[in-house]
Swiss-Prot record:
Lineage: Eukaryota, Viridiplantae, Streptophyta, Embryophyta, Tracheophyta
EC number: 3.4.22.-
Protein name, entry field: NEDD8-specific protease 1
Species the sequence originates in: Arabidopsis thaliana (Mouse-ear cress)
This protein's encoding gene: NEDP1
Lineage top rank: taxon: Eukaryota
Family as reported in the entry's similarity comment: Belongs to the peptidase C48 family.
Signal peptide positions (record): none
Keywords linked to the UniProt accession: Hydrolase, Protease, Thiol protease, Ubl conjugation pathway
GO biological process, alphabetically ordered: proteolysis
GO-annotated molecular function: cysteine-type peptidase activity; deNEDDylase activity
Family annotation (Pfam families): Peptidase_C48
Enzyme class: hydrolase
Function description: Processes the pre-form of the ubiquitin-like protein NEDD8/RUB1. Has the capacity to discriminate between NEDD8/RUB1 and ubiquitin. Has no SUMO protease activity.
UniProt keyword Protease, yes or no: yes
Amino acid sequence: MGNTSDDDKILSYEDVVLRRSDLDILNGPIFLNDRVIEFYLSFLSTVHSSTTISLIPPSIAFWISNCPDTEYLKDFMKPLNLRDKDLLILPVNDNSNVEVAEGGLHWSLLVYYKEANTFVHHDSYMGVNRWSAKQLFKAVSPFVSNGDASYKECTDTPQQKNGYDCGVFLLATARVICEWFSSGGMKNRDELWFANVKETVPDLVNHLREEILALIKKLMSESVSK
């Protein structure tokens, strides 16, 4: 058998390429990287395949938030057709240096719900990403509404108990919100998804790493057998 490397490609899924090192990240108490975040958001996109839901990859959300050229940003945003979306899922990272790939120390989640014309920020660590979330909100808002969308911090967001599970909380929260929406959440527009997140996420994060790892191994096995 040949030698293996952490950089070995193990799976191509949609537009995401996972490497062997990503399995180690999921196995251990380690901060989730962009690839793992993008992979699971892409998987959720296939599960919740409605054209009115858009789960934005971390790299795209980061670029939108930090693009210095407003005219270029307008051209960049056109193919995303965000005005046609009822639910928009945006990962937030506190990296402010566009020259540093996969920088940053914390993940959180920004959600836009068209029915309420509201952006909601879910932060699992005492709201430390508030500034980054508001920056992303200001950048995206003109492309989903007439600039009159509101911004809300969800203070009931379940909180992490360590320094490395923020990405897991992001993904768990995104999953619960997508499930809420797909199960007819629009009918409960006054309550939104807050109760679902508060009740479901704390348990979900306890086994989500293992669940994602099992999913990757299943997809790897299926790709080999094709």
